[in-house]
Swiss-Prot record:
The keyword Lipid metabolism applies. Its EC number is 2.3.1.15. It catalyses: sn-glycerol 3-phosphate + an acyl-CoA = a 1-acyl-sn-glycero-3-phosphate + CoA. One of its GO terms (cellular component) is plasma membrane. This is Glycerol-3-phosphate acyltransferase. The gene is plsB. Pfam families: Acyltransferase, GPAT_C. It comes from Pseudomonas fluorescens (strain ATCC BAA-477 / NRRL B-23932 / Pf-5).
Amino acid sequence: MTRSPIRRLVFGTLRRLLYLWVRSETINQSSFTLDLDRSRPVFYVLQNPSLTDLAVVDTECTKAGLPRPVLPVSVGNLLEPAAFFYLTPEPDWLGRQDKRGAPPTLTRLVSALTQNAAEDAQIIPVSVFWGQSPDSESSPWKLLFADSWAVTGRLRRLLSIMILGRKTRVQFSAPINLRELIEHNKGHERTVRMAQRILRVHFRNLKAAVIGPDISHRRNLVKGLLNQPLVKQAILDEAEREKISPEKAKAQALRYGNEIASDYTYTAIRFLEVVLSWFWNKIYDGIKVNHLEGVQKIAQGHEVIYVPCHRSHIDYLLLSYLLFRNGLTPPHIAAGINLNMPVIGGLLRRGGAFFMRRTFKGNPLYTSVFNEYLHTLFTKGFPVEYFVEGGRSRTGRMLQPKTGMLAITLRSFLRSSRMPIVFVPVYIGYERVLEGRTYLGELRGASKKKESIFDIFKVIGALKQRFGQVAVNFGEPIKLAEFLDQEQPDWRTQELGPQYRPAWLNETTNRLGERVAQHLNEAAAINPVNLVALALLSTTRLALDDRAMARVLDLYLALLRRVPYSPHTTLPEGDGRALIQHVKDMDLLAEQSDALGKILYLDEQNAVLMTYYRNNVLHIFALPALLASFFQSSSRMSREQILRYTRALYPYLQSELFIRWPLDELDAVVDQWLEAFVEQGLLRFEKDLYQRPAPSSRHFVLLTLLSKSIAQTLQRFYMAISLLLNSGQNSISAEELEDLCTVMAQRLSILHGLNAPEFFDKSLFRHFIQTLLDQGVLRRDEAGKLSYHEALGELAEGAAKRVLPAEIRLSIRQVALHRSEDAADQLAAPAQND
């Protein structure tokens, strides 16, 4: 581009003609704008010469109010006719191209800045993507039409514009400060080469992040798995074990590979984008995305593994859609084989899903093929997504991590750590989950149903409901190498053996699962439904008058702003009354008026369903609710007393709810909450004692409601300890105690009308008992029977007096004392039927 009026006229005409058909958008304009210093000259750099790319960039700069690349720009005494250059020099009139040469504009810029130390310039790498698809070496359609790793000629670019021009995306990267490079004092030529090298690496990493790394066709990829040493050995072992020929075993391995592998196609991604755009707009009031900028930065140069929480079947569709819309490659998604249904399974496979069986036990050949497939994806740098919870959470809580996929990932990384792996937690928060009706039945005790293609019609039938908003929060990434450095500092130098199964693998994988779960909870998106559910489920009759309800919600918001749970946690907009109106509009909250005002309440169906939404945020309120519980039975406590009982109970709450604070940070966090309580009038601090308000006061009612949030969890803890103590030393196993707790919790829920199915969730008791063992409170003898410290009873009763009302403690002790006959009958029944 020169200052020639004729050339400017030709370029302007080309741009107008191009945009008769082309539609473009900028992927990350907002984050880019924040990094730009408008006081310094700006130059844009494109990777390869292309007049159409330049026209698109010029259009996007004009739309955003940024300096245009085709206008002159001055740097000191240097006047450049245009503010752009190509990293790869333009060919001469014979089509010859000297790739070793440096862009003349870059050379002149370095000279000008070297001669004038007061001047500076910003270089902004810009990429234009005509479509967004990974390469497939045997797919001429993609090679012709979609942006890939193939070199694009004029004919192919013309076809790309015709076919994919209406889906053109521009990515501006963070500016490179040329002055900073010059200050390294490397000399003119070396500075130019350094700038070129930085730009080449940048473009390569960005292209991998946006369109995906170079990957071979599915058929060749699957066949290639069979040539890997570990799979070859597994085939020979299978042939020997099953008494079949190696050829038959190899054919079986090939069938496994085809069953597993995705068939990632750009056509399917675009089809899903169109369908899902309609779907989201049809049922949701909006999708809020938070903290995506960090992912866009870290995606370049890393193998990204997205680890979302799992609340709905649409989780993976939503995440892939958002990543694609924001210029990142949709991941390959681990899906259960139960989703490989007719029609739906094929579409999911083409959208990036690869299918896995629920269990690998007893099938080493399948295990080997699956592990090798994942290793191939990881080492090629292709993004992957899987759910550490395994299945969808039916209770709204974060489920205990299933560590199988994490272990496979860790072993793959130990085998080859060339591509650094980073886990990106993704919290997906729904105001109304799509499968709510199904979960309602399961929350009431119905068994889990197998997925069917006909389930799609149930979803269509639910589209008339209001589903509110969805929030997608990207949490703090976890770099696997840094995690291993903390857990196993010498992991790089250890001899790991051919299967890459070090002795510390299981324990380290478990801790990695806990870390992922904690980071997921840190990224929680708190919404109006969560807070309304938390408030009303803490009342005796599931009802509050509207003014009291607004006060409770305002209190919760004030506390969360005063003591933020995490930098990645988000809060709803508006005050208590706005939140109430929002939930009423979604038909989740009933209202009744009388002479004194309005009563807000939950009907029977919503009362059960709202436990799901309360549980989404229970981990955030667990610690303040525990502190509030101390003042239900005690009118005053010292800081030392509060800390002592908090330290005693916190490990069990932390383990169950994946609360973020380690024990050595607990005291400081407790102090923050106590200060917030005093500021809000929930406590008074006088004469070195924290004192509760008068029982008849409004503030005491608020303190009591807050304490009820965690009451059922504390009751479960006390019940398990009471049953253990009643059984005596070395008389009951962990499994027997777990079954006994479940039976007794069901009875207690009937006696007290508890409408919370997780109260008698067997897995929660199992985890609590395991935590007692991990903490050294319990021990197993040679027969597997449990023993406990002699002071356990006194300690448990002392803590219970602080957090549970006397009538609840009495009821639990009575149930524990009279459990023998009925519990024995119920536990014996299954054994007699076997």
